[in-house]
Structures are given as structure tokens and as C-alpha cells.
């Protein structure tokens, strides 16, 4: 990777961080302003409106943005509060399957959503699970898979090509998500693209794992590993500078599907919030940290 490419990526990362801060601050400012301006009228109307606590299960990479958007939404809809459950999409899928209360599920990969959707291919939904309201399902966001290294790294890992060479030489420690985590599944595709044997590398002590993307990000940030593969949104939130971005040929598109569950305790309110997540106001927050609309 040449100096121009690195400089451009650093600029984009800095711009992304600035955009994220601006978006989250703007949303918070809007929330405070809205809460103040409607205080008297909201008090009267909220007495008549039934209080709702929406239970949202969402991929860990959505932590910062959904918390901010939730505050904005509550400012405009005082009767609605949120209980967020952020974790790996695989863990969330299992919790839903085991009967956990959930109104809205936002996954970082299609696989975990498909495994709960009776209308999905039987090759994926092998157990015939029927938890998702298929009519409510949308492809909400797109993310990017990026390669990050600790600040000040001198390993020369400045691209996926360079990462592959170091992994072949087995002279670094690399962190990736578990196989049941979407970011781990995308990373597996990248390893396969470079014809690298994950099992052999793990046995040689070259690969370490995180149970979700936040754990991978933390290991890179703390310098516990020489490199890690995360989403660009998590890199921005952690202040990491991505050194390379995976292409579609390497791992495909990173699409976040969202759907209301059939057994949702607050199905109608969940559908209204899902509609809100697709508005320009919400998308401004998502785009501020590197997401894009599908």
C-alpha cells in the first residue's frame, strides 16, 4: 500500500470520527431541545399514552448509534423507553431461540436472521424456526470489514495482502471473531480468499479469538495482538485507523437485517421504531460512524 493510500485512509478515518461525534452530538442536542420544548404538552399526553419498554436485541457494533438514536426517539415519544441487549448476533439468535423476550432483532449478518425466519431457505433454517415476522423484515444497513493494527505498530501490516504474508510466516498474533459471530464469518471468508488454513494457524498459536466484535476491537486497541479484523464502525468508535478495507470479492457485502419478532410483547411499537430507523434523522447517526443505507 503506498503512502497516498495510507494518508487517504487516515483522512477518511479522521473524517469518520468527526462525523460520528457530530452526528451523536447533534442527535443528543436535538433530544435535549425536543425534551425541553415539549415538556408541558408531553406530560399531559404521556399520561394518556400507554408506557412501552421496547426490547431491542442488536449486534454489538450498533451499541453507540442505537443508544443515541434511542435517546432521540424517547425525546419525541416520551411514552417509549428502551432495553437494549447488545452482543454477537449468534448469541442473540440463541437467546431468542431459547425464549427470551424481544421486540426487535437487528443482526450483523443475514445468517442469524435467516435461522429464525421460516421463509428463509431450509439450507440455512435447518430447524424450521419461526420467530421472525417476515413482513417486517428489512435490510437496514451496510457496514464494511476493515483491517486494524495497534497505534504505532512496526510490523508493517498495512494491507490484507501484507496480513496474509505474515500469517503464512506465522510471525504475528492475529485476532478475529468466533465462528458464530458475523465478523468472524466474514474473516473466515477473507482467510479462504488467501487460501489460509484457519485451523492450522490457530493450532500454531497465530490466531486468537473474540466472542464479539467489541472484544476483537479491544484486543487491537490495547495492543494485545498485532492485527485484527473488525467493522469500520467499531474502528471509528474506538479511535482506530483502518489500514485496509475488504472488498466484496473477499467477504461479500456486510448487510444488517432487522425484523420484529412474531412473539414481540410490543409489536406495533417495534414496527414504528423500525420505520424510524430508516428515516433521514436516524440515518444521519448511522452514517456518522461509517454505516450506509442499503
Where are these regions (language model features)?
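N-terminal secretory signal peptides
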Residues: 1-26
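Exported/periplasmic ABC-transporter solute-binding proteins
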Residues: 3, 30-39, 43-76, 90, ...
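Generic low-polarity alpha-helical segments
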Residues: 8-12, 76, 116
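A generic structural motif
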Residues: 77-82
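N-terminal post-signal-peptidase region of extra-cytosolic proteins
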Residues: 91, 127-133
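Periplasmic-binding protein-like
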Residues: 102-107
Amino acid at each position: 500500500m503506498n503512502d497516498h493510500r495510507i494518508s487517504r485512509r487516515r483522512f477518511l478515518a479522521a473524517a469518520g470520527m468527526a462525523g460520528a461525534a457530530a452526528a451523536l452530538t447533534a442527535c443528543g442536542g436535538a433530544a435535549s431541545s425536543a425534551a425541553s420544548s415539549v415538556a408541558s404538552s408531553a406530560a399531559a399526553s404521556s399520561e394518556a399514552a400507554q408506557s412501552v419498554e421496547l426490547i431491542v436485541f442488536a449486534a454489538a457494533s450498533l451499541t453507540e448509534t442505537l443508544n443515541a438514536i434511542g435517546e432521540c426517539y424517547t425525546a419525541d415519544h416520551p411514552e417509549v423507553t428502551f432495553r437494549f441487549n447488545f452482543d454477537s448476533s449468534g448469541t442473540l439468535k440463541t437467546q431468542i431461540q431459547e425464549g427470551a423476550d424481544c421486540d426487535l432483532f437487528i443482526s450483523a449478518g443475514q445468517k442469524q436472521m435467516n435461522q429464525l425466519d421460516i421463509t428463509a431457505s431450509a439450507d440455512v433454517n435447518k430447524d424450521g424456526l419461526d420467530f421472525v415476522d417476515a413482513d417486517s423484515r428489512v435490510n437496514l444497513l451496510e457496514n464494511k470489514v476493515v483491517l486494524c493494527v495497534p497505534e504505532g505498530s512496526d510490523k508493517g501490516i498495512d494491507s490484507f495482502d501484507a496480513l496474509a504474508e505474515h500469517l503464512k510466516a506465522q510471525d504475528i498474533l492475529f485476532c478475529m471473531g468466533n465462528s458464530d459471530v458475523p465478523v468472524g464469518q466474514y474473516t473466515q471468508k477473507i482467510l479462504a480468499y488467501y487460501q489460509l488454513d484457519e485451523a492450522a494457524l490457530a493450532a500454531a498459536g497465530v490466531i486468537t479469538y473474540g466472542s464479539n466484535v467489541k472484544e476483537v476491537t479491544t484486543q487491537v486497541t490495547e495492543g494485545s495482538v498485532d492485527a485484527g479484523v473488525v467493522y469500520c464502525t467499531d474502528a471509528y468508535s474506538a479511535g482506530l485507523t483502518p489500514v485496509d478495507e475488504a472488498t466484496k470479492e473477499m467477504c461479500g457485502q456486510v448487510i444488517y437485517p432487522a425484523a420484529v419478532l412474531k412473539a414481540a410483547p410490543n409489536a406495533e411499537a417495534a414496527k414504528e421504531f423500525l420505520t424510524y430507523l430508516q428515516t433521514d434523522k436516524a440515518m444521519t447517526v448511522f452514517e456518522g460512524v461509517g454505516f450506509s443505507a442499503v
